[in-house]
Amino acid sequence: MSNLGKVIQIIGPIIDIKFDSENLPDLFNALEINAGDRKVIAEVEQHIGDDTIRAIAMEDTEGLKRGMEALDTGKSVSVPVGKEVLGRLFNVLGKPIDGAGEFISEESYPIHRPAPSFEEQSVEPEIFETGIKVIDLLAPYQKGGKIGLFGGAGVGKTVLIQELINNIAKEHGGLSVFTGVGERTREGNDLYYEMKESGVLEKTALVFGQMNEPPGARMRVALTGLTMSEYFRDQGQDVLLFIDNIFRFTQAGSEVSALLGRIPSAVGYQPTLATEMGALQERITSTKNGSITSVQAVYVPADDLTDPAPATTFAHLDATTVLSRSITELGIYPAVDPLESSSRMLDPRIIGEEHYEVAIKVKNILERYRELQDIIAILGIDELSEEDKLVVGRARKIQRFLSQPFTVAEQFTGMQGKYVPIKETVRGFKEILEGKHDNIPESAFLFQGTIEDVLKKAQQMEI
């Protein structure tokens, strides 16, 4: 027998509905409100008194009015999962929004699910090879880890994300789920068509809850993407989950919290900030079956890293990849800052002594070069000691060797993309540090894959 209630109050996206006190819907249950020509889905957030619930709408509340009937579905919002979701674009409710025809899925999962238990989780730290030299060498990713991607507008976040999707699909046979949380619709549109052109779309599912949507949708869309990822992980796959932008998840939660009448916490954020973030992040993990590696773009409000939203996010991250405008100005891409980026995987017990030593030496030489730049700017390079001149020469080669042509950018750069295994990356930088390539001009190191590519380029330059 269907459990029906009546809408008694609507304040923006918040809807109060009266049910029979014997049949009050459970928290997080999905409700269907019949608004004539369409059904509006809302989620139960609070019980008020004996017979009234307060729900947050997942869709626009335009056209709703008091007295309308609301049906308790008896379960939380469920979204389609399985290989059918690949190559398609969904909203928070798992409905396709790409206009690419009918969609039929055999299975669906509820978006509210428990995190894997301790017994199910994999505890062995394992490197996730990206094939991108600067990341693999200096700030390696953990399989099943969480990575924060920091960078302003136009420094190459999207291209880096696309290259990661491309590399996991082609080199590891892995899948990706891209979740757009509260970002610009135009950017999502661009990403969709760029992915289509570069051929990575069929290995990716996209879920969008953009900034024009109600706060309920923006708060839950990250869970929709995560649920699709969990299915693939449980099937033994390695999945890449992109969340762009994790700050908007917190922001939407703050809006919902205020609308529900909760007393705000520090800087006006919701009092449940850490709990909400933990509930999402704890589900992103490796199990004995497969892994979910998450790359999360992090917007830092007013560049204040102590703001509660980014500060709460930091507690969960295993690695940070910082994209820097000063590096894009040098014409070096990917514009990853080798000194600002960090990873807890940079440990000799995990990556091995050789890799660790090479990474630390590369960081040291780049740090020394940064210190010398002021002297060079004032006095010129000729005033440096012979030892410092050698350091500068090698640092400039290392800086250029950290650049790399990307497969997804081939149509723009005209250069063939390169995937570089970690062993080759470590060997290449070790040889530069040992001075084996001191005689090669630094321009030969720019946009090359392995050290062999550099030697080939140097030979061509001599001809």
Curated annotation (Swiss-Prot):
Disulfide bonds: none annotated. ATP binds at G151, G152, A153, G154, V155, G156, K157, T158. Its EC number is 7.1.2.2. InterPro entries: AAA+_ATPase (IPR003593), ATP-synt_VA_C (IPR055190), ATP_synth_F1_bsu (IPR005722), ATPase_a/bsu_AS (IPR020003), ATPase_alpha/beta_chains (IPR050053), ATPase_F1/V1/A1_a/bsu_N (IPR004100), ATPase_F1/V1/A1_a/bsu_N_sf (IPR036121), ATPase_F1/V1/A1_a/bsu_nucl-bd (IPR000194). GO terms for cellular component: plasma membrane; proton-transporting ATP synthase complex. GO terms for molecular function: ATP binding; ATP hydrolysis activity; proton-transporting ATP synthase activity, rotational mechanism. It is an enzyme of class 7 (translocase). Keywords: ATP synthesis, ATP-binding, Cell membrane, CF(1), Hydrogen ion transport, Ion transport, Membrane, Nucleotide-binding, Translocase, Transport. SMART domains: AAA. It is found in: Cell membrane. It catalyses: ATP + H2O + 4 H(+)(in) = ADP + phosphate + 5 H(+)(out). Belongs to the ATPase alpha/beta chains family. This is ATP synthase subunit beta. It comes from Clostridium botulinum (strain Hall / ATCC 3502 / NCTC 13319 / Type A).
